[in-house]
Amino acid sequence: MTLETAFAAYEAVRHRLPPPVAGRPAPERARTLADVASRYDAFLLDAFGVLNIGETAIEGVAERISDLRELGKQVLIVSNAAGFPHAALMEKYARLGYDFAPEDVITSRRTLLANLNGPAGMRWGLMATPATGLRDLEDLDLIYLEEDPAAYADVDGFLMIGSAAWTEARQALLEAALADRPRRVLVGNPDIVAPRETGFSVEPGHFAHRLADRTGVVPEFFGKPFANIYELAMARLDPMPPRDRILMVGDSLHTDILGAQAAGIHSALVAGYGFFASGDPHAAIAKSGIVPDVIVDRP
């Protein structure tokens, strides 16, 4: 998927996303977060496009985080990461050179689990990669969604958390099962795409919006740009700053920036990495009407 098709895909599902704040002034331009650090007490950092691109850390960001902490700032990761257990994610961040307490990493996976409700004994069909294991999910009655149509027919609901092993054939089975018998669909990663070293990967949000378009089943989304993940992040901040002194930092207008507006906090769009690394953020801002407070070249 290209930048243009990814942007168009997000624009096509705006009716399922929170509305932007209208009438915002043009964003300020800054070189790095250091230039605006004095205005904020807490920084919520996206992962892909801010901390890393795929499996590669963005140079200088670990040092920036250290500098912010030395200034007394609270720094959390707020990421639409759902495909890996929390412990595996912590191992990844450590491997990339980042030092975070597990409680300071707020993910869409954690958000889904914190909000999971329904009748006792529900059996869930799971969109995930078996190789990542079921840590964090041990208390749920799960079956992997693979090639057996019976699994899709028999479960009480569906959890979409990882799409690396997902196929068009499995998507067709899921859509057919929902058309035959509508059930709950919970999405642990609303991202449509994520920036990788070689381009964009397709994420669970892509398939969730597709099935909504084709079946009429409205998925329940957990993660940016929806309020649930920001509520979890706010609960971690101690002391809780005024909302205009909290800055969400991300590379995506439709998740990071839109979600920050919905949460009533400020936002900084990273223009030099991630979604807009090879594109024009100003044109996208004008077209979408999603306006960050600040555009930074790099974190």
Where are these regions (language model features)?
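Short glycine-rich or small-residue beta-strand-to-loop segments that form or flank ligand, phosphate
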Residues: 75-78
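Conserved phosphate/oxyanion-binding catalytic-loop motifs
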Residues: 81
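Asp-based, Mg2+/Mn2+-dependent phosphohydrolase catalytic module
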Residues: 1-45, 53-56, 62-73, 84-106, ...
